[in-house]
Amino acid sequence: MREDGKIDYVELPGGRDLPAVKHFYQSAFGWSFVDYGPTYAAFQDGGVDGGFQADPEAGLKAPLVVLFAQDLEAMEAKVKAAGGVISVPIFAFPGGRRFHFTDPAGNELAVFTEE
């Protein structure tokens, strides 16, 4: 069950060859994937849900921890009030919406809601 403020999934850089990344994790660890377009593949059997973002233009250079919120706008307001800086405004993607923020230490995280 998804809960506000809990880690929901981890997004990892997928590099320029997403099929090769998927093949590696399938072969080495037995993971299976669900593709969301040509540049994103989600996994659910790696111990925690997650996905690989293959679009080199997306700017993802490190793992991205994604938190969950029922009310995305309310959570965005809480993040701002607590001193977080919104680095990517709310946007839609297949399966939901999310925003990114940086914490006081400069770590980038995201908050997601289902649609």
Label the model's feature ranges.
Residues M1-K22, P63-V65, E115:
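N-terminal beta-strand motif that seeds the catalytic metal site of vicinal oxygen chelate
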Residues D8, T39-A41, P63, R97-F99:
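Short beta-strand micro-motifs in enzyme catalytic cores
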Residues Y9, G14, F24, W31-F33, ...:
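Tryptophan-centric aromatic hotspots in well-structured domains and transmembrane helices
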Residues Y9, G51, K78:
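Residue-level hotspots at or immediately adjacent to binding/recognition sites across diverse folds
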Residues P19-A28, F99, E108:
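Conserved active-site alpha-helix within GNAT-family acetyltransferase domains
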Residues F29-D35, V85-I90:
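Short secondary-structure junctions
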Residues W31-A62, E108-T113:
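Conserved short beta-strand elements that form part of the metal-binding/catalytic scaffold
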Residues V66-E108:
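Vicinal oxygen chelate
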